[in-house]
Amino acid sequence: MVKQLKFSEDARQAMLRGVDQLANAVKVTIGPKGRNVVLDKEFTAPLITNDGVTIAKEIELEDPYENMGAKLVQEVANKTNEIAGDGTTTATVLAQAMIQEGLKNVTSGANPVGLRQGIDKAVKVAVEALHENSQKVENKNEIAQVGAISAADEEIGRYISEAMEKVGNDGVITIEESNGLNTELEVVEGMQFDRGYQSPYMVTDSDKMVAELERPYILVTDKKISSFQDILPLLEQVVQSNRPILIVADEVEGDALTNIVLNRMRGTFTAVAVKAPGFGDRRKAMLEDLAILTGAQVITDDLGLDLKDASIDMLGTASKVEVTKDNTTVVDGDGDENSIDARVSQLKSQIEETESDFDREKLQERLAKLAGGVAVIKVGAASETELKERKLRIEDALNSTRAAVEEGIVAGGGTALVNVYQKVSEIEAEGDIETGVNIVLKALTAPVRQIAENAGLEGSVIVERLKNAEPGVGFNAATDEWVNMLEAGIVDPTKVTRSALQHAASVAAMFLTTEAVVASIPEKNNDQPNMGGMPGMM
């Protein structure tokens, strides 16, 4: 494909037009009085949203140079969303401010490399100051405040707070669409996996079609069990203890399944067989998780273990197991706490190292099941459009809350960034490096300025007063009042604010040091003239 090129000022100005188009569409949503953006959807109703990253992803510009500029800012939003889960609009506003101010200086003859050094220096000091001003999130009310501010809805904040209280900070909280009007919270305690009983004759409650096992033994193996004789010695030991058993295996079939069902119907013993969850290597890992949670040993050829040699002390135990047609839930496994903690740490390390979103999601699910359970927030709304918008807000609020628990909170509404202004202004530098520091200084006030303008106020007036206010005191755009932001519950997660600043600075620095842009020339549609119809035939 043939390429076209632009150089120096022409290249940067073309990309700046793209940056401005995307940023101007996104920044109208920031703050409590931010507006919505309507996104056209080809086969469904238009989506109305104020979620920065969702808007950014939809923008595709016709001009290839402008589109590259837009994609750079889109990358800021995506990266911030990936790391912190929220703060995408703040990151976009910061990136636009740094790029605009930086480009003015480059046009005036400043050295882009010097500007980059100044930007990096200023951001490092700003991030350190943010961490110094950060406060830990320690109770349920503070968690609810973070969620409520992010979603602009107190009820959502309360649901997230309750969910985190019940399943722990590492627990999985999923967001699903409800068929009703109301939003509800549902909690599944313990480890649940999507495999049910292998025969309906295994149920203990025929009305509910559920098998409920109290204080059961749990056999965990990756083998197929076809012969009843293979597990008979083990089952005899279980029968003597007068306790039920859950068999988790690759598959229970043939003679083994028939005899388990017959003995269950005769009342000889209570046994429920389920297929092992997952596939391939993931199945092995999930079986190990279950074994660690319940104190079992996985019966596998990898360890040189055979079912015939299995004894009762190789089985795990739990306070309760519930098996339905589709799911198995293990509650309060009796595994060793130290082993569980070690497994949790291992999974956290794998989550940090993996580059695959799919793998990360599956690892987080496994972590949650070990750490305490799964909570489901079922989102209700009056229309499909409202449902989608509400679901996006809850996802952002959940991510914000997790970030707050991880790194603490700072004053919200852009106040935290202005609070570090003084520290950054004390950096000693000269020449283009000093100019780079000044670019960041101006950008630090951009979110507050935009929040004020979205509320119909003069941004510059609010910024100047905020610079002279006590640390933590900020402008509440929802009520047009000056308040202590932390006391008023107007807070932002430190991780979100920090990530937004770092990613915005990174892209701005790359933008300013760009000297040439290479783009593909769009192919023209050379429509062929219509062929005349065939002449009539005799």
Curated annotation (Swiss-Prot):
EC numbers, comma separated: 5.6.1.7
InterPro entries in alphabetical order: Chaperonin_Cpn60_CS, Cpn60/GroEL, Cpn60/GroEL/TCP-1, GroEL-like_apical_dom_sf, GROEL-like_equatorial_sf, TCP-1-like_intermed_sf
Enzyme category, top tier: isomerase
GO molecular function terms listed in the Swiss-Prot or TrEMBL record: ATP binding; ATP-dependent protein folding chaperone; isomerase activity; unfolded protein binding
Keywords on record: ATP-binding, Chaperone, Cytoplasm, Isomerase, Nucleotide-binding
GO cellular component, as recorded: cytoplasm
Function noted in UniProt: Together with its co-chaperonin GroES, plays an essential role in assisting protein folding. The GroEL-GroES system forms a nano-cage that allows encapsulation of the non-native substrate proteins and provides a physical environment optimized to promote and accelerate protein folding.
Name the record gives this protein: Chaperonin GroEL
